Regions:
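Non-catalytic connector elements of ABC transporters
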Residues: 34, 43-160
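Internal alpha/beta loop-helix hairpins
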Residues: 1-57
């Protein structure tokens, strides 16, 4: 797969690699299936950094192959929609999950093997969780419900 913008190659590689590891916001949004969050780096901790979005709780993001990130930098991160878990406030987070962004359910679409849950996590932008069908219907959410959007820390990827 080759993703181009205005006649220039942004990223090329096997489809699975480009989809799962987009290099930048353009590729992530073009390929779809990603939530992109923007913020400022609040702290760098060896193998990870903390991304701050306004008054929200900081998000821990592994540095992975990305180097040269410093405190105060503005950066985008991507989290695949199928890596986002939704839990009710007060419930325990799934193992390995640390970030928990309060959100309100704005729409629900049944897609067959998963349920697409749209959230107001990011003002004026789309944030979506693909919840497995059986998981969703075991304890379904309704439009207007408050939930916590969470994911395992190493599933967040810094973008260029």
């Amino acid at each position: 797969v080759v993703v181009m913008e205005q006649g220039r190659i942004k990223q090329a590689g096997p489809a699975r690699e480009v989809y799962a590891h987009p290099r930048d916001r353009y590729v992530a949004e073009f390929m779809g299936g990603q939530n992109v969050l923007s913020g400022r780096v609040a702290k760098v901790n060896g193998g990870s950094f903390l991304l701050k979005q306004g008054a929200r709780e900081a998000i821990e993001v592994p540095l992975q192959a990305r180097r040269g990130i410093g405190v105060g930098d503005t950066i985008d991160i991507a989290v695949r929609r199928d890596d986002v878990a939704l839990v009710r406030p007060g419930a325990s987070l799934p193992p390995g999950c640390g970030t928990a962004l309060p959100s309100r359910v704005t729409a629900i679409e049944y897609q067959g093997y998963f349920v697409k849950v749209m959230l107001d996590t990011v003002p004026d932008d789309e944030f979506v969780a693909y919840v497995p069908e059986k998981t969703f219907f075991a304890d379904p959410f309704n439009v207007g419900d408050v939930v916590l959007a969470t994911w395992v820390a190493d599933r967040a990827r810094p973008l260029a």
